[in-house]
Amino acid sequence: ISLQFTTTAGFVCLAGCVLLMRDRVSSRWLGVLWVVIAALIRFMAAGLVGLLMAPIIVYVLRLNWRRYIPIVVMLMLIVGCRAFNRYVYERDSEWRYYREYNQLRAQLNDNPNAYRLQPSQLPAEVDWIDYQLLLRFIPDPEQIDLKAIRQLSATVGSVPLHEQFSNLQRMEKYAVEIAILLALLVLMILTTGNKTKFLFLIGYALFVAVLVVHVSMDGFLKNRVFICMLLPLLVTDFMLLPNTTGLKRRWGIGV
């Protein structure tokens, strides 16, 4: 696996979430540190893993409110780091321009709806050839500036909902990845004999399905995103499968 920023943040956030469920207090606070670091590496990847881990964390912690204190502190730290980051870098106009330009450009490149636009749908300031160069990751910043990128982003965001649902047809390219996700969910559902766990897994499966559909409506299900979705499922599978050995489950060194 190529440990680029997205995948690295996913692994680090996963380790932190697992530690948050441990009984030892020091382990939970170490988990806070890992999740905060993951959010600093790649916020969206950490958020995706955290979102998928949230149901199992709540399932394990139940109504033990004291164990939620590290999680509350963790969320406050993440919000504080994001606010500090914005405060420091937003004061530099060149950096602010660069960050917003490339953020919007990346969103357009990753959005299948951007490839549906016809020449007549483009803003008047954007030439069709320049737009095609933008979609091929070689934009001309003099021809498509931040103002044009904003207009294109708004245009792509206004694509009708029924056209966004048609993007689900593209998911056939990821048939293997989706089959793995479904197999894990079916395995978890079939191997549990506990009614509470069964209902939880049904709800969790629906939650994952809705999330996959949501991601696919305005983005490509890339391998790095798939890995970030697969990791929490593996952990959930490990935690909820029946343990008939009587031995304490071990996560590995430090976990």
Language-model regions, residue ranges each:
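Transmembrane alpha-helix segments characteristic
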Residues: L30, K195-V215
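Membrane-interface transmembrane helices that cradle and orient dolichyl/undecaprenyl
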Residues: C13-S27
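Membrane-interface alpha helices of multi-pass inner-membrane proteins
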Residues: R28-F43, M53-A54, V73-A83
